[in-house]
Amino acid sequence: LGLLPPTQGQVFFDGRDLAACSPRDLRALRRQMQMVFQDTAASLNPRLTVEGILAEPLRVHRLCPRREIPARAAVLLDQVGLPRDLLGRYPHALSGGQRQRVGIARALALSPRLVVCDEPVSALDVSVQAQMLNLLADLQAARGLTYVLVSHDLGVVSHSADRVCVM
């Protein structure tokens, strides 16, 4: 995703070495790769409402006219099982599970092919973890997503992964 440069080796996506891509090509590739972060308190802008958080990638990548953004944000909330009345709220007013769902919705806004999930459920209660894993599985089936799931919890991995790499 380009958040940090690789210290060794190469990172390929769709047959392309990301380190060798031009900034323009990398921007286009980033639309196809998104991230769900572990710490939603740090990854969601506290100065933006949920609608603003979901609108940001749509604006940056110019995916739809500005007047359509509120409707797109509402549909994204529907897809992650959140009520539309959360659009006007700020991240601090949401539960941990709701914030994680907003993070997932933000990742889905660009219709990526690959989503990197960095410990997406480790900060959540066990009951909410199961709901979140089921949501991720449902979204994967509906959208044909590929996940790279980073987790220390082998139970989460066994529930979610088709292939496993232990580091």
Task: For the regions a language model picked out, list residue spans one by one.
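A short, proline-enriched helix->beta-strand linker immediately N-terminal to the Walker B motif
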Residues: 109-113, 129
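Hydrophobic anchor residue at the start of the ABC signature
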Residues: 104, 132
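Conserved ABC ATPase "signature" region
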Residues: 17, 68-85
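Conserved ABC transporter NBD signature motif
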Residues: 9-17
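Conserved signature/switch motifs of ABC ATPase nucleotide-binding domains
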Residues: 31, 92, 110, 134
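ABC ATPase NBD coupling module
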Residues: 5, 18-34, 60, 66-67
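Conserved ABC ATPase signature
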Residues: 90-94, 98
